[in-house]
């Protein structure tokens, strides 16, 4: 009698799988992402006024440092200079302060929890590109408080010993290893606040 639910065919001692449509398919889990925005109204006129032309200059250098095994950037560690990255300047308004506080309370990238500025708020910004030494400039700034942000990618080289074989002379046994290198890519978010107190001054800042 033929078995209509048979999923294997046996011929000459060989087993062949036969495709049978499953009655149930488990759906993939969707990555849950939470996005938060400040619950404060954005004053575009205030932001526009803060970004109007002045006569002060903000000059800075952007860099990061490689974290140690405890996830800490050592104070005396070598600088990794920000080569050709975009630095964004935002005016520090009440809306921005609400966003910054909300980010401290809610942001958790591992749990896919993000805090964003509104599109209108992010539109009021200035941008600069660093040179190969990490230097950048924002000219013609008015007195005020500003927030700087950039994302600095870099590659960390690590090493390990790969076992290649064993030799024995009958008395002693020796294991041999080759030193191998591999790379890990990182991207650090670097930020700083800067205050321009008066027109005509040059304010220097370290963005790290």
Question: Where do the model's predicted regions map?
Answer:
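A short tyrosine-centered beta-strand micro-motif
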Residues: 141-150
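Short, acidic Ser/Thr/Gly-rich low-complexity loop/linker segments typical of extracellular
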Residues: 95-103, 112-133
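Short, charged beta-turn/beta-strand-edge "cap" motif at the junction between a beta-strand
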Residues: 153-154
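Short, surface-exposed beta-strand/beta-hairpin micro-motifs centered on an aromatic residue
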Residues: 132-140
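Primarily secretory-pathway and cell-envelope proteins
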Residues: 23-108, 157-208
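Bacterial Sec-dependent N-terminal signal peptides
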Residues: 1-24
């Amino acid at each position: 009698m033929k078995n209509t639910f048979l999923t294997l065919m046996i011929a000459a001692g060989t087993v062949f799988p036969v495709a049978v449509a499953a009655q149930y398919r488990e759906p993939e889990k969707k990555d849950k992402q939470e996005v938060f925005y400040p619950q404060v109204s954005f004053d575009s006129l205030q932001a526009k006024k803060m970004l109007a032309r002045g006569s002060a200059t903000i000059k800075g250098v952007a860099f990061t440092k490689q974290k140690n095994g405890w996830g800490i950037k050592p104070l005396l560690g070598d600088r990794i200079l920000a080569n050709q990255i975009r630095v964004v300047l935002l005016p520090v308004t009440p809306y921005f302060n609400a966003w910054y506080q909300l980010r401290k309370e809610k942001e958790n990238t591992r749990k896919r929890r993000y805090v964003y500025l509104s599109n209108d708020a992010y539109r009021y910004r200035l941008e600069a590109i660093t040179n190969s030494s990490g230097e950048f400039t924002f000219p013609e700034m008015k007195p005020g408080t500003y927030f700087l942000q950039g994302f600095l990618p870099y590659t960390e080289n690590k090493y390990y010993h790969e076992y290649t074989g064993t030799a024995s002379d009958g008395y002693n046994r020796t294991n041999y290893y080759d030193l191998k290198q591999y790379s890990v890519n990182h991207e650090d978010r670097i930020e700083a606040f800067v205050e321009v107190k008066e027109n005509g001054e040059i304010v220097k800042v370290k963005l790290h």
